[in-house]
Regions:
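Mature extracellular or lumenal effector domains of secreted proteins
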Residues: 1-128
């Protein structure tokens, strides 16, 4: 992810026929990078709510109209993932800024761990 003149990478070790086969059907497929690895893509400004932490391919809040992300992590301010108000990743959309499709969004009203953020980035996805 390219943010503020820095490029940072994370490795997701996943077997599949193609990246398309992992995301096209819309089914959730978990990953296990952990919230700190996702936040590291943003740098020291990365911010997520402390709960839910649903990460992977096609991660979304239980109410899919709220937050969805093709590759990344979503967070919530208390247990459960019904109304997620923060996210980091690629191919994102939803509350509170539907125009931020790559980067970090965290609504400051709902206790994200590093304050409210709306950081837009450029995504690089390399497939081997």
């Amino acid at each position: 992810m390219h943010i503020n003149q820095k490029i940072r990478f994370a490795v997701i070790d996943r077997q599949a026929d193609s990246l398309h086969s992992l995301i096209a059907d819309g089914q959730y497929r978990n990953t296990s990078l952990g919230r700190d690895a996702w936040k590291a893509l943003i740098g020291s400004q990365g911010s997520l709510q402390r709960y839910c932490n649903k990460e992977g391919f096609n991660a979304l809040s239980l109410l899919s109209s709220v937050v969805k992300i093709r590759i990344g992590i979503v967070g919530h301010d208390y247990g459960g993932c019904s109304y997620c108000d923060s996210r980091i990743g690629f191919g994102a959309g939803g509350y509170p800024d539907d125009s931020n499709v790559c980067g970090n969004v965290a609504d400051g009203r709902y206790d994200p761990d590093n304050g409210g953020k709306n950081i837009k980035g450029i995504g690089y996805i390399l497939v081997q």
